[in-house]
Amino acid sequence: MAQIRIMFILSFTLMSNLGKGDDLYEDYTWHVNKIPRIVTSNVFHLKSPNFDAEPKLELNGTCGIECQKTLPTPSLTDLEHYLSYETMFENGTRTLTKVNVRHWPPGHENITVAKHSLRRKRQVYGTDSRFSISDKHFMTNYPFSTAVKLSSGCSGILISPKHVLTAAHCVHNGTDYVNNAKKLRVGILKIRSKRGGKRRKGSKRNKGGEPEDADSLSKGGKKQRRKSVQKRSAAEEKISTESGRERGSSGGKPSFQWTRVKSIQIPKGWFKEVTEKMSIDYDYAVLELKRPHKKKYMELAVSPEVEKMPGSRVHFSGFDEDRLGQLVYRFCSISEESSDLFYQYCDADPGSSGSGIYIRLKEPNKKKWRRKIVAIYSGHQWVEVNGEQQDYNVAVRITPLKYAQICLWIHGNNADCTQG
């Protein structure tokens, strides 16, 4: 019954998008943006961190959109300071890399002009609009398979064969690294046979394009859904969250394959001594894995304005704390935006922090639609509004400068990061 309900809602979402008309589709296109260059200058060796911080999946005292309106626009020197970054390696050593920003006109970043002022509190309340993806075909195939679980309790998303994007607060509290960051692991869902072998033959990727989510999940063949319903037991299948690579007793069910993290990179803007009021804008980090995965990853894109997103809608999947072992998908509308943040109406719970938020737009001059990551889900935050603390679900947008920085972390140079 739950699976039928999900299919109905996803079908309704698809039809609502298709009903907007072809003329409007012309606005829903990925545009090629010229990206500023971030050039590394000096590298300094730092002493090893203490790893004393406790993981904190909900932040308090955040300076959000309203609070940031009162702040001056950062200068180019400020931005270079914020975008300098720290790298922490698996052996506990760390470095600070200073950067220079080139080809970036002043005054184009961190302009916090709020839009879409309709506001309401949102974590999980009333009717829960989240969907647990229990079908093995869907949860281990793109785009759902890009969602990963961190051993620190957060979520993340695959952005290259060896890199994961997540929230900075999942590994660092702004003062020190969390206590399990030194031995941080990333869990990727895979289907294991009874012998712990390879993917079952029946679990194949779709041919000739991207598989399903809310916009296209309903297009899956009836045969696959019928088989799924027949095979599913009365109780939802549980995903084992035990440490290490699971063997033997998995019985063909999805389970996590855990991979150690080789290094963690965090912008200096996240550290409290650098940007006390604007640290939320830099709540993102990239994890480099010790070994590459074989899953399809999702590309990054500069976040467009909300009006250029179909239905002002965003999507993301993660591993919510209140649904232990389940991959949880949701889609919702954005309520308010600035150049660096947006508030959204997605139901969520601690554990989903760090998820990659994506949208689906057309490729230029093509009929093909493609999903790309445009923000990182920071989580349910208590933000300052008119001198008081109010709670909202907050996402950190991928701006041109953040795109340039994350791209540099992935490729190790800025030659491959000129357009986004």
Write out the residue ranges for each language-model feature.
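N-terminal activation segment of mature serine protease catalytic domains
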Residues: 43, 50-56, 63-64, 72-155
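C-terminal cap/linker of serine protease catalytic domains
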Residues: 200-226, 232, 294-298, 374-420
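Catalytic nucleophile loop of clan PA
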Residues: 157-158, 347-377
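Conserved catalytic-core segment of clan PA serine endopeptidases
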Residues: 118-142, 178-294
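Chymotrypsin/trypsin-fold serine protease catalytic domain
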Residues: 234-240, 280-352, 388-406
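Catalytic histidine site
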Residues: 139-191, 337
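Cleavable N-terminal signal peptides of Sec/SRP-targeted secreted and luminal proteins
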Residues: 3-21
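Extracellular/periplasmic catalytic domains that process cell-envelope and extracellular macromolecules
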Residues: 140-143, 157-159, 177-180, 252, ...
